Amino acid sequence: MMKRQFEDVTRIVIKIGTSSLVLPTGKINLEKIDQLAFVISSLMNKGKEVILVSSGAMGFGLDILKMEKRPTNLAKQQAVSSVGQVAMMSLYSQIFAHYQTNVSQILLTRDIVVFPESLANVTNAFESLISLGIVPIVNENDAVSVDEMDHATKFGDNDRLSAVVAGITKADLLIMLSDIDGLFDKSPTIYEDAQLRSHVAVITQEIIASAGGAGSKFGTGGMLSKVQSAQMVFENKGQMVLMNGANPRDILRVLEGQPLGTWFKQIEEVRHD
C-alpha cells in the first residue's frame, strides 16, 4: 500500500483561492483567514518554510467598493483589484500578527519570471524573506498585468502561478486549497459514482480530458488549470496535494500523511510500505 511521506518536507507553497476567502455573500471569510494564519504560523514554529500564494484581490475590492458584479472593463478590473490587494494584505498582516508571524507582499507579472535577471532578483527576494522567518504572500500584480484579467494574453491563473512559485523557490511541496475534495475520475456534481483519485503519478490524456479538456465531463470549474499546475510541478521534480480548503487545519493532517485530497507525485519516487 502506498504511503504518503512528508517528514522531510521543509519548504511548502500553499495556494488559496478566492472561493476560500470570500463568502457566497461577497463578504470576507475572516474565520477561514484566521485558521489559515494559525496553521501557517504553527508550521513556521516547527521549522517549516511557508510561502502563501493568495488570490482574492478582486473579491476584496468588490466588497470594499460595494460592487455586486465584477466589472467587464479591463481598466476597472485593475482598479478594483488594486484596492482589494491593499485591503487583503492589511488583513493578512493584522491576523498573522496575532500569531507573532510577519508577512510580506510579492506581486509578480509574467515578465519577471521570463527574464533571467528579474527572475534571479525575485528568487533572491524569496530567499531573503524566508531566511528572516517571514511568510511571503504572493499574487499577480493585477494593477499592471492583463494576464489574469479577462484578456486573451493570459499568463495563467493563480493555480499556475503557485506552480511557478514552487518551481523557482525549489519548494518540497505545493498544497493547493480548493472548494473540492481533489481530482475525481469524472464530475462528482453530475455523476454519483465519481471516484476521488487518491494518487496521480502520470498526467495522462484521460486525466486532462476529465479535468476539462476535449470531451470533458467536468466542463467549467477550473480543474484543468490545477492538472496543468500539477504537470508543471512534475517537470520540476516536485509534488503537490490538491485538497479541500474548507478547513485549513486539514493541512496539518495532510503533512502527517493522512490520505486527504489527491496526491500528485511521480511513480518512480513513490515509497511503499
From Swiss-Prot:
List of residues binding substrate: 55, 142, 158
Keyword set, alphabetical order: Amino-acid biosynthesis, ATP-binding, Cytoplasm, Kinase, Nucleotide-binding, Proline biosynthesis, Transferase
Record carries keyword Cell cycle: no
Keyword Kinase: yes
CDD domains assigned to the protein according to its UniProt record, in alphabetical order: AAK_G5K_ProB
Gene3D superfamilies: Acetylglutamate kinase-like
GO molecular function, one term: ATP binding
Any one GO CC term of the record: cytosol
Entry's EC annotation: 2.7.2.11
InterPro entries: AceGlu_kinase-like_sf, Asp/Glu/Uridylate_kinase, G5K_ProB, Glu/AcGlu_kinase, Glu_5kinase, Glu_5kinase/COase_Synthase, Glutamate_5-kinase_CS
Pathway noted in the entry: Amino-acid biosynthesis; L-proline biosynthesis; L-glutamate 5-semialdehyde from L-glutamate: step 1/2
Record family assignment: Belongs to the glutamate 5-kinase family.
Function: Catalyzes the transfer of a phosphate group to glutamate to form L-glutamate 5-phosphate.
Name of the protein in its database record: Glutamate 5-kinase
Organism: Streptococcus pyogenes serotype M2 (strain MGAS10270)
Lineage: Bacteria, Bacillati, Bacillota, Bacilli, Lactobacillales
Gene: proB
